[in-house]
C-alpha cells in the first residue's frame, strides 16, 4: 500500500470503531418496542448491544378508537351501537387521548445472559393461563419443561439436558388423562413407548433401543382387541407379524393375506 492508501484504511477503521461504539451505546439500557397500533410489544434491557436481564413480551390485545359522541372508547361489543361503551371493560388511554387499548397481557417472559436465554421462561395464553414453563442454560433448553392446555390441564412434561430430551416424557389429553409416555436418552427414544385411548385403555406398547425399533410391538383397538403385533431387532422386522380386524378376525399374517 502507498502512504495515502494506508492513511485511508486507518481512517476507515477508526470510523468503523466509532460507529460500532455509537450503535452499542444506543442499544444499552431499557428498550421498549410497540405494535403498529401503538400497544406495547416488548420490554427489556440491553447491555453492550445484546439482550441482558429480564425481558417481557406482550399480546397486542384489542385497540379501540373513540367514535362515540359520549367521549368514551367504543369497544364495539356484539349488540352495541357505535356510540355505546361497555363500561364493564377496562381499557387504557394513550397519550393523545384518541386511542384506547386493552390492559397489556403477558405473552412470554424470561431472562437473558449475554444475549442467550437463561433460567426460567414462561409463556401464557391470551386468557392469562400458563402455556409453557421451560428452563435454559446458555441458550439451550436444560431442565424441566411443562406445557398446559388453555383450560389449565397439563399437556406435556419432560426434561432436557443441554438441548436434548432425556428421561421420562409424558403427554396428556385435554381432559387430563395420560395419552403417551416414553423415555429418551441423549435425544433418542430408548425403552418402552406407551399410548392410551381417551378412556385410559391401552392403545399401543412398543420399545426402542438407541432410537431404533426393538422387541415386541403391539397395538389394540378401542374395544380391546389386538390390531397389530410384530417383533423387531435393530430397527427391522424380525420374525412373524400379524394384523387383525376390529372384530378379532386375522387380517394379515407374516406378509400373506388370509
Task: List the model feature ranges, each with a label.
Residues 5, 71, 101-102:
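Selective for proline/serine-rich intrinsically disordered segments
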Residues 59-74:
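Internal, charge-rich low-complexity segments
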Residues 9, 75, 105-106:
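Intrinsically disordered, low-complexity segments enriched in proline/serine/threonine
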Residues 1-8:
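Short, Lys/Arg-enriched N-terminal segments with co-localized hydrophobic residues
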Residues 68, 77-85:
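Short acidic, low-complexity intrinsically disordered linear motifs used
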Residues 21-63, 81-84, 90-258:
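Glycine/tyrosine- and acidic-biased, solvent-exposed loop/turn segments at the edges of beta-strands
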Amino acid at each position: 500500500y502507498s502512504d495515502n492508501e494506508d492513511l485511508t484504511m486507518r481512517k476507515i477503521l477508526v470510523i468503523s470503531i466509532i460507529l460500532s461504539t455509537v450503535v452499542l451505546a444506543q442499544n444499552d439500557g431499557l428498550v421498549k418496542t410497540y405494535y403498529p397500533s401503538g400497544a406495547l410489544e416488548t420490554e427489556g434491557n440491553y447491555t453492550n448491544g445484546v439482550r441482558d436481564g429480564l425481558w417481557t413480551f406482550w399480546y397486542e390485545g384489542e385497540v379501540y378508537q373513540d367514535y362515540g359522541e359520549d367521549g368514551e372508547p367504543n369497544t364495539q361489543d356484539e349488540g352495541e351501537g357505535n356510540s355505546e361503551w361497555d363500561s364493564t371493560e377496562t381499557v387504557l388511554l394513550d397519550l393523545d387521548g384518541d386511542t384506547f387499548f386493552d390492559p397489556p397481557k403477558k405473552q412470554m417472559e424470561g431472562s437473558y445472559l449475554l444475549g442467550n436465554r437463561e433460567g426460567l421462561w414462561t409463556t401464557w395464553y391470551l386468557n392469562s393461563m400458563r402455556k409453557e414453563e421451560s428452563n435454559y442454560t446458555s441458550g439451550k433448553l436444560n431442565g424441566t419443561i411443562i406445557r398446559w392446555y388453555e383450560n389449565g390441564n397439563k399437556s406435556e412434561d419432560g426434561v432436557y439436558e443441554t438441548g436434548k430430551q432425556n428421561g421420562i416424557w409424558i403427554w396428556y389429553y385435554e381432559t387430563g388423562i395420560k395419552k403417551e409416555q416414553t423415555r429418551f436418552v441423549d435425544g433418542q427414544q430408548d425403552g418402552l413407548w406407551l399410548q392410551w385411548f381417551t378412556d385410559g385403555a391401552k392403545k399401543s406398547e412398543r420399545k426402542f433401543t438407541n432410537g431404533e425399533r426393538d422387541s415386541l410391538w403391539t397395538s389394540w383397538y378401542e374395544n380391546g382387541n389386538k390390531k397389530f403385533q410384530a417383533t423387531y431387532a435393530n430397527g427391522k422386522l424380525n420374525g412373524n407379524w400379524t394384523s387383525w380386524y376390529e372384530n378379532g378376525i386375522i387380517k394379515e399374517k407374516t406378509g400373506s393375506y388370509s
